[in-house]
Amino acid sequence: AQEAVVSLLSIANPITFNETEFFLNQSKQRSKTLFQEQYIPKDESLEHFNQLMDFSFFNKEIEMELAVRQKVEMVQQREEKDKFAKVNVTESPDGKEYLVDYFLSESPENGDPYVEYNIYRFKQSESGGQKNFLMVSYANRIYGDLKYAAKSLAKQRDHLMTTMIEYQIPEIKVAQASSGN
């Protein structure tokens, strides 16, 4: 049996997105300021997933425009070699959040080719005088014929964008890391 992973961000497990239950697969402190958690449906693996939810939480201030620009440029750089790469930016009506959604494709030497659709939601917050920055992302992969996969994902885009916009982000509290003494 898989050992239960404990959420460093105090997020309930499982979470539900787009009528699918996602279970915490990994929770890591990547640096002094970055905590990352990845959730996948029950019978999937990080190596070969169809859907993935990612929470990347920075307990420091990050400039929203910079984070958005970096994500957009990452996709734009792929566009030269990846004919399925395409990126869009959407600002929330109140201007407090941004969504970056994009398509990309991979044709690995070993393994199945896939097209992946990602939505990143960027949100700044503050707790106890401490500024924080959160990226919530959802990825959906379809393996196999790239043209079919791209068409199929494109048809889901509006629904998935609405689902992400309406998604109630859980309250995040960084668990006190044990110092190991």
Report each predicted region and the residues it spans:
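Short, well-structured beta-strand
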Residues: D101-S179
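Mid-chain, structured segments of secreted extracytoplasmic proteins
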Residues: F49-T90
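Short, hydrophobic/aromatic-rich segments at coil-to-beta transitions
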Residues: P93-D101
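Secretory pathway targeting signatures of secreted, lumenal, and periplasmic proteins
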Residues: T20-K60
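Sec-dependent signal peptide cleavage junction
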Residues: A1-V5, A175-N181
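Short N-terminal edge-element motif at the start of the domain
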Residues: Q2-Q26
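Hydrophobic/aromatic beta-strand elements that line small-molecule binding cavities or substrate pockets
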Residues: Q38-P41, K86-T90, V115-E126
